[in-house]
Regions:
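Short acidic/proline- and small/hydrophobic-mixed sequence motifs that coincide with surface turns
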Residues: 164-166, 329-333
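Hydrophobic, small-residue-rich alpha-helical packing segments that form membrane-like cores
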Residues: 691-725, 735-738, 742
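Non-catalytic carbohydrate-binding regions of carbohydrate-active enzymes
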Residues: 730, 734-763, 794-915
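Bacterial N-terminal signal peptides
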Residues: 3-12
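Substrate-binding groove/exosite segments of carbohydrate-active enzymes
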Residues: 34-80, 253, 308, 451, ...
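Acidic/polar, glycine-enriched structural segments that form the non-catalytic walls/loops
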Residues: 18-34, 38-39, 47, 123-131, ...
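Non-catalytic C-terminal accessory modules of carbohydrate-active enzymes
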Residues: 55, 66-68, 74-134, 138-143, ...
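Short beta-strand elements of extracellular/lumenal beta-sandwich folds
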Residues: 149-158, 315-328
């Protein structure tokens, strides 16, 4: 009866008319016995909860009970769309006949609390009540269990009628083919290149290759558009283009499509193999070339030894690449490769690209139907289609595929069935690497388990596996069926095609072994996953909106994490929005729950920063683009990178009370601070912002800026704290001596009397009096690290009030990033960086208000943001970097790393870092 009553109550609630969404408290018979959250009608949420764990890959389960994309098969980029031949079917057979329906036709409500989803189904004349709990093992404090590549599905079936019913649930799964670096197709942030073999070029000779960037409303229109390309593209002095340089996209067209980056490379022989071209990103941009001349319509580049020139010129619909031999000897085996990072309609999440052998083009399309292509009137001999972050290395190394390789047949698969009284499991895998999946149904008293066997005429492909569980239900009876999905794809590769693997392959030798582990530990995995949620939901000082946000905000730990075979653990900024490995300005915010709950993994990542620290002390901005772990670069946002590393190192030390950690990281801290001090070019004690971009990378600051200055001051305080802890009195005094003039300059240059202005460049007699919502970020971090106040208390309190009354004025759904003194929104940044609202900054503002003793300023704004995400947008499992402050709609940066900073509200409100 204890099991039956909650089920009956929840079924009655599901059958009630849909009301306005709100937070509720829901009860279950096992952990978490109480859930505080939003129970959505099916189809209302605009995001799907990811099932998966730390570095395992994920599969999405949407509010209809459908599997809507996966990132399991050696790829971290999700393959979107509802998965065909996949899902659950429920059948009820009795004296009146048999009724069989797919689960999505039955689901009525959906309650997501990562990593669990509770679905209520039935009604609509169906003779059974159905309650489904889907869960992946995820245990705060236990990284090993949290990295189990499996999902568990529990069905509770209720017979409300007066007659006996034979109930069956069938589970079918279309096993994804293992993703390999084939170079013929990709899904996500697609890029690629086309290549031409131009032969030998005699002295004085030249060759021209025209390249077109074409957009079309549909694939059907593309061939016609290729015949008459129109439009223009942007071109810089390096014969290339990178949207980040100007904060805008190229290739505007009425039918959609945009061009984020383009560039080229040459490979040839001249007394030995040579290469020359543009790297598009990083510094320096050019290899083997120097700028000779630049006009808006063309760029002339030359080899330093005078052996060749490359002229890149704008033509209708594209660019022309003219290569001249300006030397005295022939250039042998000349090859040209042209690169493009294209989007079909500026919607990165579902872009799909491929090398089309028929068109001789790199084609990109998305769910809108719009498409674009990189093509030429001169047929290419080769090319590559990949994902941004790994393709540029191949471009520079001339590692494309010949055109006759642009078509590949899928690999064969082997399958086997395991059937005994305990369970029925069907495994489908690639015999080479044992890569594949196992679907299983667990046995039990009165449970009949059956492997899925498609009829010979079935249209299901051979990769589909499936199992069925059957039980008898008497009148009023409740019975349970348990299913699980396990996966094993051990051959993951980095962007350059080198093996990186998965950590879980050290514990398991195939998906069947994963399934056995999950089956034997079913109760333990569900119980421990639910218990930490109970501690959050049971905390009386947490409002409902915050409890719901804390639990669900952890989803990026499944979506964006990588745990490699060699043990390295990292997070991506956003695998579908901006795939960069451990972007430090995002980690600064988003690593808070990792430091709280998985300290060994936090140390793991921080040690990688130690390993990648440059000889001059500079800390890298990231470990690499895309799926890259050993290509660090330090120039991007260098005015923040080293300071933020120091603050994270001290945060970890302070929270863990770990003197050994302090001793390990202290030498790197001193080197990082020494490098950061070199960025004070005018001697005012503050870092100069014009030296690089910062967190708002499409919004340039100059001179001293409130955002970066505050972080620098807090970092100096952290350096002094390290020195004091370790008994280094001389270095403590050095840090404090550097801190004092910096604080004075900050007050003199940035304090307006009500708030800290955006920036002030006294050398140029120029400044911006914009009020930045995040101007107190350095003070926020000083608070959370236990470093006290680095700004005058009366000023930071005044600034908090001013931010609330200006950046938070009106009915905005998040603090507007920049407000001018006249109350208008700052438009000086591009891509919305100045005039939109960054989600994380509202969470951080609220936390700062709590630390400063002004909760009434921050908590209402945090609550408004949380309600927008949960009740208006339905985007709890896909939060972006920024949103439209007026409409509340998500904008750029899907599934974003930094938003996990909401977890600092737990510490600020409760005064502790543990559950």
């Amino acid at each position: 009866m204890r099991m039956l009553l909650p089920l009956l109550l929840s079924l009655l609630a599901a059958a009630a008319p849909a009301a306005e969404l709100g937070y509720g408290t829901f009860h279950f018979p096992d952990p978490p016995r109480t859930v505080v959250g939003v129970r959505y009608p099916a189809g209302v949420p605009r995001s799907a909860l990811p099932l998966g764990g730390l570095g395992t890959g994920t599969v999405y389960l949407d509010s209809h009970g459908r599997f809507t994309g996966q990132a399991l098969a050696n790829s971290y980029r999700p393959a979107g769309g509802v998965m065909a031949n996949t899902g659950f079917t429920v059948t009820a057979a009795g004296a009146g006949g048999s009724d069989s329906r797919p689960l999505p036709a039955l689901v009525q409500t959906y309650l997501g609390h990562f990593p669990m989803a509770d679905l209520e189904a039935g009604g609509r004349g169906f003779p059974l009540g159905v309650q489904v709990r889907a869960c992946s093992p995820f245990v705060l404090g236990d990284a090993r269990l949290s990295a189990t590549p499996a999902a568990l599905f529990r069905f509770r079936l209720h017979n409300p009628g007066r007659r006996r019913v034979r109930a069956a649930v069938s589970f079918r799964w279309d096993t994804p083919l293992p993703s390999e670096a084939t170079g013929t197709q990709a899904q996500g942030n697609v890029d690629g290149f086309l290549s031409w073999r131009l032969g030998d070029l005699a002295p004085g000779g030249e060759v021209v290759v025209p390249v077109f960037f074409v957009t079309a409303r549909s694939l059907a229109d593309l061939k016609q558009e290729l015949a008459r390309p129109v439009g223009t593209v942007d071109l810089d002095a390096d014969g290339a283009f990178n949207w980040e340089d100007g904060g805008r996209q190229s290739l505007p067209a009425g039918q959609g499509g945009c061009l984020s980056q383009h560039g080229f490379y040459l490979h040839y022989g001249a007394g030995g193999p040579r290469r020359a071209g543009t790297l598009v990103v990083g510094s320096p941009r050019l290899e083997g070339l120097v700028r000779a001349r630049y006009r808006r319509h063309d760029a002339l580049l030359a080899a330093p030894d005078g052996s060749l020139q490359v002229q890149v010129s704008k033509i209708t619909g594209g660019l022309a690449y003219r290569v001249r031999n300006t030397g005295r000897q022939a250039l042998s085996d000349l090859r040209l490769s042209v690169y493009a990072n294209l989007e079909a309609a500026h919607s990165e999440g579902d872009d799909r690209g491929w090398l089309d052998a028929g068109l001789g083009a790199l084609v990109v399309t998305d769910g809108t139907g719009a498409c674009c292509a990189l093509a030429s009137s001169r047929p290419p001999e080769g090319g590559w289609c990949g994902l941004w972050g790994g393709t540029l290395t191949r471009l520079a190394q001339d590692e494309g595929l010949l055109r006759n390789q642009w078509r590949q047949a899928p690999r064969g698969r082997g399958s086997r069935v395991n059937l005994d009284y305990q369970w029925c499991a069907v495994t489908r895998e690639d015999p080479r690497h044992r890569a594949g999946c196992t679907a299983a149904v667990l046995g039990g008293r009165g449970v009949v388990t059956i492997p899925y066997q498609p009829f010979p005429s079935s249209a299901a492909p051979p990769e589909v596996v499936g199992v069925t569980g059957e039980v008898d239900l008497g009148p009023g009876q409740v019975r349970e069926l348990r299913f699980l999905l396990a996966w094993f794809y051990p051959d993951a590769r980095d962007g350059a095609g080198s093996f990186v693997g998965h950590q879980y392959a050290r514990w398991f030798d195939g998906s069947l072994a994963v399934a056995r582990f999950a089956a034997r530990n079913w109760d333990l995995l569900l119980r421990r996953t639910g218990e930490w949620q109970e501690r959050i939901y049971g905390e009386p000082r947490l409002p409902a909106w915050l409890a719901d946000q804390l639990v669900n905000s952890l989803y990026p730990l499944a979506r964006n994490t990588c745990w490699l075979y060699d043990g390295r653990f990292t997070q991506s900024e956003s695998f579908i929005g901006c795939p960069i490995t451990e972007t430090i300005v995002c980690r600064f915010y988003g690593s808070i729950p990792l430091a709280m709950f998985f300290p060994e993994l936090e140390k793991n990542t921080m040690r990688q920063f130690l390993r990648h620290q440059r000889a001059d002390g500079a800390i890298p901005f990231a470990f690499g683009n895309g799926e890259s772990w050993d290509s660090p670069y330090c120039e991007t946002q260098q005015i923040l990178d080293s300071s933020e590393f120091v603050l994270m190192a001290w945060r970890d030390c302070a929270w863990w009370q770990d003197r050994a950690w302090a001793q390990e990281v202290y030498p790197a801290v001193k080197q990082a601070l020494a490098f950061a001090r070199t960025l004070d070019t005018d001697g005012d004690g503050l870092i100069n912002d014009q030296l690089s971009r910062q967190y708002y990378d499409c919004w340039q600051f100059s001179g001293a800026a409130s955002y970066t200055s505050g972080i620098w001051l807090a970092a100096l305080r952290a350096g002094a704290a390290f020195a004091r802890l370790l008994g280094d009195a001389d270095y403590e005094q050095q840090c404090l001596a550097a801190l004092r003039p910096g604080q004075k300059s900050s007050e003199r240059k940035l304090w307006t009397g009500r708030y800290y202005r955006l920036w002030n460049d006294t050398a140029r007699a120029d400044r911006s009096d914009t009020c930045l919502a995040a101007q107190l970020t350095g003070q926020w971090y000083a608070y959370l690290c236990g470093l006290g106040e680095v700004l005058p208390r009366e000023h930071l309190l005044a600034a908090l009030e001013h931010i609330g009354s200006t950046n938070g004025a009106g009915a905005v759904w998040g603090l507007v990033n920049g407000l001018c003194p006249d109350g208008s929104r700052d438009q000086s940044g591009s891509n919305g960086h100045s005039a939109t609202a960054t989600l994380g900054e509202t969470w951080c503002y609220a936390a700062t208000c709590l630390y400063a003793g002004r909760p009434e300023l921050g908590l209402p704004r945090a609550e408004r943001l949380a309600r927008n995400l949960a009740l208006r947008q339905g985007r709890l499992w896909n939060t972006t970097w920024n949103l439209d402050p007026d409409r509340g709609e998500m904008l750029w940066g899907d599934q974003y790393y930094s938003n996990m900073c909401v977890w600092d509200l737990w510490g600020a409100l409760l005064g502790r870092r543990r559950l």
